[in-house]
Amino acid sequence: MKSHKMMGGGISMHYITACLKIISDKDLNEIMKEFKKLEEETNKEEGCITFHAYPLEPSERKIMLWEIWENEEAVKIHFTKKHTIDVQKQELTEVEWLMKSNVND
């Protein structure tokens, strides 16, 4: 895991956990291909510590996102990136619930 420092010397991280409900009729495997591409590109972003997308049971048609970012600004920038916009335009999912927390060490 990459380490990131705050000006004060401690580590600051922004955690996000989200449950996405699949609203598209597309096959789950096709949808997950899109999310794996998103995962690969997002993990290259400056400010992204880790980003993972995992499907729940196929019958549930839900995807979990686990994300750790340097700060909230990095998250905002993430939503301006082409790979993020491309997935959003497809209207594959909607947010069922989302939890955010900031941790400073």
From Swiss-Prot:
Record InterPro entries: ABM_dom (IPR007138), AI-2_Isomerase_LsrG (IPR050744), Dimeric_a/b-barrel (IPR011008)
N-terminal signal peptide: none
Domain ABM: 14-104
Gene Ontology terms for molecular function: catalytic activity
Alphabetized SUPFAM superfamilies for the sequence: Dimeric alpha+beta barrel
Name this polypeptide is given: Uncharacterized protein YjcS
Taxonomic path: Bacteria, Bacillati, Bacillota, Bacilli, Bacillales
UniProt gene name: yjcS
